[in-house]
Amino acid sequence: METEANSNVGQKGRFYLTKNIWVPQEPIENLNLKMSDIILRRMPKLPLGGVDALKAFPVLAELKKSHDKIKADLQYLLKHHEEIPALHEVHPRDLYVAGRAWRTFLLKIWGHEIVENTAAVPDTYAAISRIPGVHTALFSILHGYAEIVPHRGSAAGVIRFHYPLIVPSEPEKCWIEIGGHHFFWREGEPLVFDDTREHWVKNQTDQTRVVLIIDFNADMPFPVNLYTALRYNLIRHSTEVKAVRDRAAIGVPPRKPATERADGLISGARHMTEVATTSRPGKSGH
C-alpha cells in the first residue's frame, strides 16, 4: 500500500518522475495531444465495436475464448466488492466520479503487474498475458445511475479495449460516447477506441456495468515509435506510476486457476469413490 515517502505523489497538476522531481502535468498532456495529430494519421480507424473490432485486432479474440473463465474470476472478485477502491483512491488526479460509484481493480499498470491482484483472478491474467503488448489492464466497475464526466487520455498512440462482462438488462441505457460516436455495451462484444479522443459514460439504470479494460500501444513507424517508446519508459519508471501500483494492491484472497480447481474436483471425486469402495460391506460367509 501507499507509503509515507510517496504520500504526496499524484498531486493534481503534477507528474512525478521521482519522489522529489516533478513536472507540470499540462505541458506533458499538451505535447502528447499535439503528437496525437501526427500519430492519429498512423492509427487504425477507430472506434470499432463487435465483429469489426475483432477483425481489426484478431489477437483480442483470446478474451472471448476465455469468457467463461474471466466471468468466473469476476464473480469471485465481486464477493469482495467493498474492498475494491474507487479510481480516485488509486490515482488522486482522476476525479471523474464523486464517491465510490466508479471502482477499479488494477491488474497491470504501464507494464507493472500487481501480483496481489492478479492472484485473485488468475484465469483473467493468463488470457491477458497471451495478448502481446498489453501494458495496462483492469476491471472497471460502474454503479447504477453513475456518470463519468467527459475526459480524454494524454498518451497518444494507446489503443483502449473494452471487453464487457456485466451489462444492465437494458443495455441501450448504459452507454459511452467517444468523439461524437455513441456506443452501448453488450456482454462479450468488444469495443476499441483511441483514449485521447474525448469520451464520457452514463449509466441510466440501477444496475452495475463491468468491463475489462486493456491498453496497448499501436504499432508506429520510425521515428514516431522512438517517441512512443521513450514516453512509455518515462511513464513506466516514474514514481507517479509506482505510487498508483502500490495504492491499487488490495487484499483479495488468491484464487486457483480453473485447471487446478478442476483437478481438485476430480481428485476429490476419486477419493470419495475409493472411500465408498473400501467401506462397502463384503459378502458374509455365514
PLM regions with names:
Residues F183-E198:
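Conserved metal-binding segment of the jelly-roll/cupin
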Residues I141-G144, S154-E170:
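Short, conserved beta-strand element in jelly-roll/cupin
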Residues E170, D206-Q207:
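Short strand-connecting beta-turns/loops that link adjacent beta-strands
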Residues I148-H151, F193, H199-T205:
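Short beta-strand His + acidic residue motifs that chelate non-heme Fe in jelly-roll/DSBH
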Residues I166-E187:
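A short beta-strand-loop-beta hairpin characteristic of the jelly-roll/cupin
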Residues M1-R152, R209, P223-H286:
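Fe(II)/2-oxoglutarate oxygenase catalytic core
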Residues R160-P164, V192, Q207-P223:
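A short hydrophobic beta-strand segment most commonly corresponding to one strand
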